[in-house]
């Protein structure tokens, strides 16, 4: 049977192949996030195109692997999950170096770094000169930065760490082989802010003993983002590196502005941010950005070994799927949702006799007092919220107890300060939160709180007395089905 595929169809086939190749080659030449997002079919085509460049996937030759690592994968499912990109990125000792037998994987790594830089430029950090995507969590990425600076500062023993009650950033210092000099925040009305004077005094006293100052831009309220502009000026004046822990700070326009201003007025050596918290990809990667290419190159050279390409792959696919046209939408939506969340939480707090902490520079996290719940019952309330499917919210109870992390003792760990308080509830509006989630959050919070307070009142009555606790009777509370 003769084929009916004629000259016209053949021309069309060649045109399709040519347009596909043109699209892929254009992407590689420009190395920028495309204007419009790609379809899933095109993303599959892109991955196949990349993997065809690795020697173990070549179709024009039969490779004979004679080394200890040849991209061999035993399980077909695992191979498909990795889209045949099995070599990883970098070479032993440098994440930026090209792997000759893994050209496609190396191209993927290059695109992820260039896309990351482009993304930061779109967000407002236009003076960033270089970026690297690493298959490490935020804490390990901070540790990698500090490790890379060891030779530059051979007398260094310490890192100034502005207290943020989140374990991984503190552990990153000790993992890199240094000790933390802990600076407690100071109180500015409701907010906990940077003690700039103490940092300046320590920098003046310690000098060459300091590896760097680590600041934090994203945190749970009432902790405020650090004053990185003032710290960068101190670091520049005394020639001390400045490491910024910007875990999920890319979601905040104010944080972006502060990072850019800190670079302009002082010194910022590296800025580390989480991929999953900012770009909605699976956990496992971080983005290290620098305002000098040499800063990022030295960090890349400190990585001991070859690295997984999975975080780079996920980030590239996400940016290609969005395109520039849709890239900023989640960030703009987060800003709107945060303002809406703050209004709702303020209204709820007023209804139940509580108040929301005023931390104007924190554009992601909120804190509400829990004065109507006895301190001994506050963590139970947090458990009730979790059992109702409210994840991520946390209750912080004031405590005199000490918590030891890496040999450092903290009073009232979780509160970012040793100061005592009446307990509070933290909730956050992170990127990707939808309107229906916010509405459901407050529906569940409202009903859970009302039932919890009524139950406490019943317990008081059974004990033969009343604590005088206010039982909210607002119409919006579901008073049925205790």
Curated annotation (Swiss-Prot):
Pyridoxal 5'-phosphate binds at residue 69. It is an enzyme of class 2 (transferase). GO terms for molecular function: identical protein binding; O-phosphoseryl-tRNA(Sec) selenium transferase activity; tRNA binding. The record marks 68 as: May act as a substrate filter by repelling compounds with a negatively charged alpha-carboxylate. TRNA binds at residue 388. InterPro entries: PyrdxlP-dep_Trfase, PyrdxlP-dep_Trfase_major, Sec-tRNA_Se_transferase, SepSecS/SepCysS. Its main location: cytoplasm. Residues 90-100 are annotated as: Phosphate loop (P-loop). Pathway: Aminoacyl-tRNA biosynthesis; selenocysteinyl-tRNA(Sec) biosynthesis; selenocysteinyl-tRNA(Sec) from L-seryl-tRNA(Sec) (archaeal/eukaryal route): step 2/2. It catalyses: O-phospho-L-seryl-tRNA(Sec) + selenophosphate + H2O = L-selenocysteinyl-tRNA(Sec) + 2 phosphate. GO terms for cellular component: cytoplasm. The modification N6-(pyridoxal phosphate)lysine is found at residue 277. It holds the Pfam family SepSecS. Belongs to the SepSecS family. Converts O-phosphoseryl-tRNA(Sec) to selenocysteinyl-tRNA(Sec) required for selenoprotein biosynthesis. This is O-phosphoseryl-tRNA(Sec) selenium transferase. It comes from Caenorhabditis briggsae. The lineage of its organism: Eukaryota, Metazoa, Ecdysozoa, Nematoda, Chromadorea.
């Amino acid at each position: 049977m003769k084929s009916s595929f004629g000259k016209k169809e053949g021309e069309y086939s060649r045109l399709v192949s040519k347009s596909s190749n043109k699209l892929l080659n254009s992407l590689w030449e420009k190395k920028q996030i495309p204007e419009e997002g790609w379809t899933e079919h095109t993303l599959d085509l892109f991955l196949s195109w990349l993997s065809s460049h690795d020697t173990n996937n070549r179709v024009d030759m039969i490779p004979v692997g004679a080394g200890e690592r040849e991209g061999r994968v035993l399980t077909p499912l695992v191979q498909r999950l990795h889209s045949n990109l099995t070599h990883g990125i970098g070479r032993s000792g440098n994440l930026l170096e090209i792997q000759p037998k893994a050209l496609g994987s190396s191209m993927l790594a290059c695109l992820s770094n260039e896309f990351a830089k482009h993304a930061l430029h779109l967000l407002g950090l236009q003076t960033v000169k270089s970026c690297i995507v690493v298959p490490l969590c935020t804490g390990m990425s901070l540790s990698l930065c500090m490790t890379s600076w060891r030779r530059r500062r051979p007398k260094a023993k310490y890192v100034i760490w502005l207290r943020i009650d989140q374990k991984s950033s503190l552990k990153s210092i000790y993992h890199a082989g240094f000790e933390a000099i802990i600076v407690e925040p100071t109180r500015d009305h409701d907010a906990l802010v940077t003690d700039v004077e103490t940092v300046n005094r320590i920098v003046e006293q310690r000098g060459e003993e300091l590896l760097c100052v680590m600041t934090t831009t994203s945190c749970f309220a009432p902790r405020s983002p650090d004053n990185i502009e003032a710290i960068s000026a101190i670091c520049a004046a005394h020639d001390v590196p400045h490491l910024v822990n910007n875990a999920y700070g890319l979601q905040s326009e104010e944080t972006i502005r502060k990072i850019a201003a800190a670079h302009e007025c002082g010194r910022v050596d590296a800025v580390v941010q989480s991929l999953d918290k900012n770009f909605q990809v699976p956990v496992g990667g971080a983005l290290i950005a620098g305002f000098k290419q040499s800063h990022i190159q030295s960090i890349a050279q400190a990585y001991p070994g070859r690295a997984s390409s999975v975080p780079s792959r996920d980030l590239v696919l996400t940016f290609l799927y969005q395109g520039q046209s849709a890239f900023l939408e989640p960030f703009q939506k987060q800003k709107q949702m945060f303002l809406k969340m703050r209004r709702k939480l303020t209204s709820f707090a007023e209804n139940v006799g509580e108040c929301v902490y005023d931390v104007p520079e924190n554009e992601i996290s909120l804190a509400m007092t829990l004065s109507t719940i006895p301190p001994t019952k506050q963590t139970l309330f947090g458990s009730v919220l979790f059992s109702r499917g409210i994840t991520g919210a946390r209750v912080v109870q004031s405590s005199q107890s000490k918590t030891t992390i890496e040999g450092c003792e903290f009073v009232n760990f979780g509160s970012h300060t040793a100061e005592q308080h009446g307990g509070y509830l933290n909730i956050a509006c992170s990127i990707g939160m939808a309107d229906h989630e916010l509405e459901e959050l407050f529906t569940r919070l409202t009903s859970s709180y009302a039932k919890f307070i009524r139950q406490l009142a019943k317990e008081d009555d059974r004990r033969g007395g009343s604590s005088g606790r206010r039982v909210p009777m607002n119409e919006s509370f579901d008073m049925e089905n205790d």
